[in-house]
Amino acid sequence: MMTVTRYHACRMIPALTLMLSLPGCAATRANTAEERPMHSINEFRDQRFADVADPWEGFNRSMYRFNFYFDKYVFLPVVTGYEFVTPGFVQQRISGFYNNLNEVRNLTNSMFQLKGVESATTLGRFLTNSTLGLGGMFDPATKFGLARHDQDFGKTLGYWGASSGPYLVLPIFGPSSLRDTGGLAVDYGISYGIYTAVDPFPNSSNGLAISAGISTLGTVDARHQQSFRYYESGYPFEYYMVRFLYHEKREIETGKAPVE
Amino acid sequence: MRLKLLLIACLILLPLPSLAADDGYGYPITGSYEATIMGTPAPLMPEFPARMNVRQLVLQVIPDRLKPPIFFYDEGLRCTFAYQKQKAPLVFLIAGAGASNQSTKLISMMKALYQAGFHVITLPSPTHANFIISASQSGIPGDLTEDAADLYRAMEVAWKQVQGDIEVSSFSLGGYSMGAAEAAFVAKLDEERRVFNFRKVLMVNPPVNVYSSAIRIEELLKQIPGGANKQGIFFNKMLSKFSEFYRYGNFVAINDDFLYAIYSERLFSHEQTAGLIGLTYRINLAGMIFASDVMTNSGYVVPKNRVLRSTDSLSDYFLVSTHLSFFDYFNEYFYPYFQKRRPDLTKEAFIESQSLRSIEGYLKSSVKFSAMANENDFIVSKGEIDYLRQLFGERAKIYPRGGHLGNLEYKENMAYMVDFFKE
């Protein structure tokens, strides 16, 4: 009887509080003693694959779960609403606009890495798309053969030899590493610095509101462009696969071969 | 962009002179393993609809199912539902082993059928964790008869959920790989239950016997130096190879160009490609074993009675589960479960029941079936391909190549599928 009430109570808790763990629900089975499983780790002498340094796994898994709920109750409803009210054509132009703004980040980091040709290409893209492409809404540069090179300060640090450090799942931003989190902060700092120097709304008393609106829309657009959904694969070891894919993709694109 | 076109052109043109003459089948990738990994190059796929009316279904198939905290994110069986505004036939599609309702191949089939005017509902494989957690009565997947019963129940619930919103003229059924074998058993069950009266049933690259196909896939892992127990070392080696190739190849990102280059430059040998397929299969199998063990509290890889919390590390279980073979699962977990319930069940009889042969009388007599297969599919033997020919006669469509499912999205194959459901 106790158990039944307990289960009912657990199921009635509003969904948001599920963000806290559910040890109460589990009480029914915990009374029985644990037994050794038929197969355990000691049997196998092999390297782990998909292995990434993750000393903060407990924290990371909590954040991973937080992001799942944040997506579900906040982020994705907003994105869905945006997609519903905005025509597809407009969505693409908005994405183009923000992608073009990010070329500034690509450019500064190509230069930090002293990559001459790449910097010139990115600068060419930015100038072409800002003018002919109407502020980035269209992408004629790609048609002219100027390929996009995504760069950020995390990659710059990696390029100059900094290792990724432990895996880190950030709230809202998602999978990252210690190095890339630092990089993210630097990139934001640089954009903020450029923004302050350029001061695009000098005579408007609503400058703050306008820039807040622009960055909010940017965040929504970024989630709109990102098709990843937490736990969507349904695969019980998804956390490890995502961790591995994130880490390897960064390692490879930074230009470092993985350690044997 | 130019590089990409060039690569695709090479891919399509190179093998053609030798092939076009003998069989007139345009799917370009000749190697069985290579086709399986590369699939169909995008320009050779049919045109898919730009927009679809589609929504996700989350179904409560087993009422009051208790889910362990580690599966807190699983809210019900997930199916994808694409619907027409007008009256149309409805096709249920079942995914292959370990695949979800949104696997790329399943979604391509859905798009092609939607384009041709069908309603479609896709279902995950009964071996996928979501199905095990939310729709499997026993929590122990892999038995064709029981999986078919679970699938049938799931289809009934899905139909109940959508029947108010659409008009349906008839029901059909399709599946690929293990989903194809399951489709046959679901169709047989439907002859008794008569809820759907399936008009047509399509099996794409079915195993003839699930057990022997699993053996053939396990064989792939034997091509790894040191065998399956050294798969971690093998994988890490392949990964370095992959990274170095990227590093020295002047690629812009990990994208289609890069992947085609891996194929055209033959980065991985035939044996290594085989090993990678085998490893992918093991990774899938690991998800099934773990999910099943947790749901049934069997103490197979997780200590019996341990309640995993949502933030507990699963790292060790991941390693253990990926190192278990199909034989381990079969002999230590799967067969004992059935033997306990039916003590007179011999292993041979049980293996034989996981086969199309066990229902061949039905399959032969019913005109509603068609099977698509590839001569060089490594999950079936030459003899099994002949068996499919003999079983289905003109209703067997055998292609000269395509590996396992590699040509499923090729436009000629998709056209055959659509025509079959239309006629």
Predicted regions and their residues:
Chain A
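Bacterial N-terminal signal peptides that target proteins for export
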Residues: 2-13
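Post-signal-peptide N-terminal segment of Sec-exported extracytoplasmic proteins
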Residues: 44-76
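Mid-length scaffold segments of soluble, non-membrane domains
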Residues: 96-178
